[in-house]
């Protein structure tokens, strides 16, 4: 079975992420959407909320599961017996950053490949940071994120 991992903080998940998951799901037998727990960052949404929002947003992707991890992605990939890591690229800057990580991952886990998928041009400017910034000013982000996320952002910034 070909299993791939799509990892990130997903704080929050965006339509760009969903597009990546759908495309990865078409390429692999199974995809694991793995939420990275980074104790150095303070997320807007707690882990349980990010898991819920992801679950509601990817219900239509039948070969996707959601999990979380801390530590090195290559260690997690070995544990899950994944054959690939899938990363989305929005720009040349993303490529330079991701290429270095992929090279180190290959050094640590030679059996693990990294697959880069170019972001759909409709989402090339979308990031979780931009979404949070725009939502914090009570602006509509419903074209940038799944409906459950748009609702959750309204609730957070209503306070």
UniProtKB/Swiss-Prot annotation:
Cofactors: Mg(2+)
Domain of life: Bacteria
Family according to the record: Belongs to the bacterial CoaD family.
Binding site for substrate: 9, 41, 73, 87
Annotated keywords: ATP-binding, Coenzyme A biosynthesis, Cytoplasm, Magnesium, Nucleotide-binding, Nucleotidyltransferase, Transferase
Keyword Protein biosynthesis among record annotations: no
Protein name: Phosphopantetheine adenylyltransferase
Originating species: Shouchella clausii (strain KSM-K16) (Alkalihalobacillus clausii)
Sites marked Transition state stabilizer: 17
Binding site for ATP: 9-10, 17, 88-90, 98, 123-129
Catalytic function, reaction form: (R)-4'-phosphopantetheine + ATP + H(+) = 3'-dephospho-CoA + diphosphate
Pfam families given in the database record: CTP_transf_like
Localization in the cell: Cytoplasm
Entry GO terms, CC: cytoplasm
Gene3D superfamilies reported in the protein's UniProt record: HUPs
């Amino acid at each position: 079975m070909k299993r791939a991992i799509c990892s990130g903080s997903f704080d929050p998940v965006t339509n760009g992420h969903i597009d990546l998951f759908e495309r990865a799901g078409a390429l692999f037998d199974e995809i694991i959407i793995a939420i990275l727990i980074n104790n150095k960052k303070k997320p807007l949404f707690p882990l349980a909320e990010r898991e819920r929002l992801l679950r509601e947003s990817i219900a239509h992707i039948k070969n996707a599961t959601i999990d979380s991890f801390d530590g090195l992605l290559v260690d997690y990939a070995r544990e899950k017996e994944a054959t690939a890591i899938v990363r989305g690229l929005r720009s040349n800057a993303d490529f330079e950053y991701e290429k270095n990580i992929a090279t180190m991952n290959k050094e640590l886990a030679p059996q693990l490949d990294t697959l880069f998928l170019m972001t759909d041009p409709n989402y090339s400017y979308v990031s979780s940071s931009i979404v949070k910034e725009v939502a914090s000013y009570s602006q509509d982000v419903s074209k940038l994120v799944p409906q459950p996320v748009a609702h959750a952002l309204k609730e957070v910034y209503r306070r």
